[in-house]
């Protein structure tokens, strides 16, 4: 049994694959299996990976390429990878990102030394090769995950494979990591954290204001809501949640945030209002919800969110340029 299985979804990532593959095959941890799950990518992504693999002959026997029978989306790809994984621990790496070459040795070493079910790390957000921010990836509780105070990304979370057996599969491809991570966290006995950034999330900005962008936003929104409603139902049916817990209320409101950049557009404002409307009566009285979040909530209802956001953004940029 390998120490670690790394699941790498592959779809239209040809320009980024060489960088990702090189950092994976260059890992200082020797005992790894690499599962490249090809979601019927129409480009040369897999060819690029195989070319890089020639530089690492010792890794050839550790690489598996599985091609999905049809383009199936991120959720199905991740679940296929989990089904194929043989490692003691499992982690995901998105093929347009990259990892520190010591990442998996550090995570696995801590997991073994402390008998952890889940071990997390911090990550760096990059754009055009420039670091934008460092994000803490630690996760201490499901409640804090649902409140949006801790991360649920699979790329910074190494999970004991036995926790992933029998999980309910996500039903859509946006927010699929939250469905998997929350279930794993509920089953975990012990968790730990490596307090340094080992993963590099490479942000590529997409417009959501033009026609194509709106279509993409609509699709992402519907997909997120499918998984959000599925997760809430799962928590209530299988894990004894009532639906009135502060973290569930805050999670419902958190789901609406995807619409905040376009909430000034009437159709999206209406969609925002109609999504989990029951939280509107509760969010202002929720102690776990920050004053800032309540402030923006009120401004959205007053239809002032967009102009105030633009003004505060201008002042922030102006102050940064003066410093």
Task: Give residue ranges: language-model regions.
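N-proximal low-complexity "stem/linker" segments adjacent to membrane-targeting elements
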Residues: 1-25
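Acidic donor-binding segment of Leloir-type glycosyltransferases
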Residues: 21-67
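Flexible acidic/His/Gly-enriched loops in nucleotide-sugar-dependent glycosyltransferase catalytic domains
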Residues: 60-61, 103-171
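Glycine-rich, basic loop-to-helix element that forms the pyrophosphate-binding segment
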Residues: 65-85
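Short aromatic/hydrophobic "clamp" motif used to bind/position activated sugar donors
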Residues: 90
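Conserved nucleotide-sugar donor-binding catalytic segment
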Residues: 141-223
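Catalytic core of nucleotide-sugar-dependent glycosyltransferases
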Residues: 199-205, 211-243, 257-282
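Membrane-interface aromatic/basic loop that binds lipid-linked glycans or pyrophosphate carriers
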Residues: 263-323
């Amino acid at each position: 049994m390998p120490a670690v299985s790394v699941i790498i979804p592959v779809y239209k990532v040809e320009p980024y694959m060489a960088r990702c593959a090189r950092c994976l095959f260059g890992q200082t941890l020797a005992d790894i299996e690499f599962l490249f799950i090809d979601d019927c990518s129409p480009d040369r992504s897999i060819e690029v990976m195989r070319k890089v693999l020639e530089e690492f002959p010792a890794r050839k026997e550790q690489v598996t390429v599985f091609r999905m029978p049809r383009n199936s989306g991120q959720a199905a790809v991740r679940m296929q990878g989990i089904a194929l994984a043989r490692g003691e621990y499992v982690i995901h790496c998105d093929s347009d990102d990259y990892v520190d070459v010591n990442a998996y040795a550090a995570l696995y070493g801590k997991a073994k030394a402390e008998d952890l079910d889940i071990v997390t790390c911090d990550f760096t957000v990059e754009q055009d090769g420039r670091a934008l921010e460092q994000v803490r990836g630690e996760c201490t509780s499901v409640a804090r995950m649902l409140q949006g105070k801790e991360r649920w990304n699979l790329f910074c979370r190494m999970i004991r494979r036995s926790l992933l057996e029998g999980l309910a599969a996500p039903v859509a491809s946006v927010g699929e990591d939250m469905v998997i991570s929350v279930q794993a966290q509920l089953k975990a006995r012990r968790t730990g954290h490596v307090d340094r950034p080992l993963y590099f999330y490479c942000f590529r900005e997409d417009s959501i204001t033009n026609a194509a962008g709106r279509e993409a936003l609509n699709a992402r929104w519907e997909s997120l809501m499918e998984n959000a409603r599925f997760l809430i139902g799962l928590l209530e049916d299988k894990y004894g949640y009532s639906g009135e817990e502060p973290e569930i209320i805050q999670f419902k409101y958190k789901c609406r945030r995807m619409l905040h950049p376009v909430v000034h557009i009437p159709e999206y404002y209406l969609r925002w209002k109609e999504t989990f409307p029951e939280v509107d009566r509760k969010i202002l009285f929720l102690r776990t919800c920050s004053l800032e979040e309540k402030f923006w909530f009120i401004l959205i209802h007053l239809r002032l969110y967009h102009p105030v956001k633009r003004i505060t953004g201008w002042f922030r940029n102006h102050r940064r340029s003066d410093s």
